[in-house]
Amino acid sequence: LAQYYLNNKRQRTQINESIRNFFAPRKDINPTHTHMLLSALPIRSYWTTNYDRLIEKTFELRGVSCRAHFSDENLSISTDNAQIILHKMHGDVENPNSAIIAKEDYEKYDDTHEMMLAKFKGEMCSKTFLFLGYSFSDPNIHHILARIRKVFDKHAKQHYCIMKRVTKRENGKKTKDYEYKLIKQNHQILDFKNYGVNVILVDDYSEINDILSEIKRRVYMKNVFICGAYEDETVNKDKIAQLGTTLATWLVERGFKIFSG
């Protein structure tokens, strides 16, 4: 639709205004529970195709510094003082003129966002991604996944995607074209698997929060906080030091992360 408008008007002023008006930060729109769960995980690099500022607002509420990159030009801005790096692949609401929305924007993406794609490709090769609410309709992502598979073959990094299972009934009503949608989803799952993306099916989107909560629990159950104090000067400090060393060694050897204060 955006491309049809550009073909007719030959300028994107109205599109830019629509993006700015629709996605502008509002006091009555706050981060969801899913946003808060994601922000609580030990993840430093996030990728999104959304224009809005909800992710930035989430970290602001947590008192965590977040640096957003939305173009090759601002990708070089220092992130030394940022705890979180947010990559907005399709642009930002405050810079609507560079937003990826029309067909020609996607076609030129390899040239206009060369550095962004290079960084995304690098992280896809070195990190594990969890895709949430992503349809994989972006041809650029498919191209990257295909190239990674070609280079690494069966040794490529494994990634995960959560999708809603096609059911016979939706909201109490019979699902239209159920058989077609089921076959299509099964083919999608196999296709994603070929690209190293493992699909996790849920019956309801609310289950995503359950999955994220379990991930959070498993991540932090390996964290151990150690602290203590003693006032008795007769205590054998060498024994205490030895106990601390023995305990720390035992924990580290078993994969625990130690925090002290």
Q: What residue spans do the PLM features occupy?
A:
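SIR2/sirtuin-family catalytic core signature
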Residues: 27, 33, 38-42, 62-67, ...
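Active-site glycine-rich loop that binds ribose-phosphate moieties when present
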Residues: 103-119, 144
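A short secondary-structure junction signal
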Residues: 58-60, 97-103, 141-145, 238-239
